[in-house]
Amino acid sequence: MGIDINHKYDRKVRRTEPRSQDIYLRLLVKVYRFLARRTNSKFSRIILKRLFMSRINLPPISLARVCRFMKKESRKNSIAVVVGTITDDARIFEIPKLKVCALRITEKARGRILKAGGEIITFEKLAEISPTGNKTVLMQGRRNAREAVKHFGPAPGVPHSHTKPLVRSKGRKFERARGRRKSCGYKK
């Protein structure tokens, strides 16, 4: 009797093209696939890889975060590159003059960048200006900022766990006893 071979590890799963059927995204992929092949720069390879990514792995980045990353004196005339969405941040009042390249920019963020005398360019334009990523600052949003990520980790309730419990209801009887009141063990 033969043995069954486990084929679980036979192939390395990685995206070689975007799952999306968006023709504009696929055109961008064509451009950056060419650049990744022909230029000897890591920048184009990273952009290409990120264009393939799922929405979960392309989290939005706030305007405040972009401003903070571009604050350094050495990054004065650089282009901020985001493979994803730039969103507005009401907590920041004044934004500097920025040159930004992103897949999407929300309406308010777009208005604020342009009002500050900034410039918004597309990835096609970026490929013309800087095919090797010269004078660019590549940035991305926090992937662990999602609500779902708070529930990952060691089980809620075990020592030193900061995992958020999955609660079906926020009523009096749910996750409100031990550790939440003095009369039930301890109050944290």
Swiss-Prot record:
Residues 151-188 are annotated as: Disordered. The keyword Cytoplasm applies. Its main location: cytoplasm. Gene3D superfamilies: 3.100.10.10. InterPro entries: Ribosomal_eL18, Ribosomal_uL15/eL18, Ribosomal_uL15/eL18_sf. GO terms for biological process: translation. One of its GO terms (cellular component) is cytosolic large ribosomal subunit. Residues 161-171, 178-188 have a biased composition (Basic residues). The gene is RpL18. Belongs to the eukaryotic ribosomal protein eL18 family. GO terms for molecular function: RNA binding; structural constituent of ribosome. It comes from the Eukaryota. This is Large ribosomal subunit protein eL18. It is found in: Cytoplasm.
